[in-house]
Amino acid sequence: LNYEYSDLEPVLSAHLLSFHHGKHHQAYVNNLNATYEQIAAATKENDAHKIATLQSALRFNLGGHVNHWIYWDNLAPVKSGGGVLPDEHSPLTKAIKEKWGSYENFITLFNTRTAAIQGSGWGWLGYDTVSKSLRLFELGNQDMPEWSSIVPLLTIDVWEHAYYLDYQNLRPKYLTEVWKIVNWREVEKRYLQAIE
């Protein structure tokens, strides 16, 4: 991480982050590495059935790692600019205003759609390189958009482990608070790379 566990307080506690990053995310990394090893062994043995049965574990753990990796970079301590929106003349601001009218409208829609995910999942803001537009996604479990044309700009984790220690069952409250530590500089950097 680019910050200490305590740096995101009071929005996310060090206690929560130590479990979320140190245990949950690490488990995805460990399981992903184990799955790669099993696939390599099955490939060496020419065991197509075993390779096929490992695909769901590969997808789940790779998604868990990638979604979390993006999420951690999407957060920043308030003292380091977390929660500070991009300049009103920035390309990202223009794109968000063109699509949703304002950051407030965007955040309200993002939160409404993401809070409605049944069970665990992720809210995503992505840039579609084909339609040249911003898109919102609500994705279950550790899924990611299926289209290779989608560049991830922002992910918000709504698995219970992302908020339960601090917010209990109040997912909407967590979604409201997390914007106070969104690293908009990182989101904008990804957007600028995507539109090149």
Swiss-Prot record:
This is Superoxide dismutase [Fe]. InterPro entries: Fe/Mn_Superoxide_Dismutase, Mn/Fe_SOD, Mn/Fe_SOD_BS, Mn/Fe_SOD_C, Mn/Fe_SOD_N, Mn/Fe_SOD_N_sf, SOD_C_sf. It is an enzyme of class 1 (oxidoreductase). Its EC number is 1.15.1.1. It comes from the Eukaryota. One of its GO terms (cellular component) is mitochondrion. PANTHER family: SUPEROXIDE DISMUTASE 2, SUPEROXIDE DISMUTASE [MN], MITOCHONDRIAL. Gene3D superfamilies: Fe,Mn superoxide dismutase (SOD) domain, Iron/manganese superoxide dismutase, C-terminal domain. Belongs to the iron/manganese superoxide dismutase family.
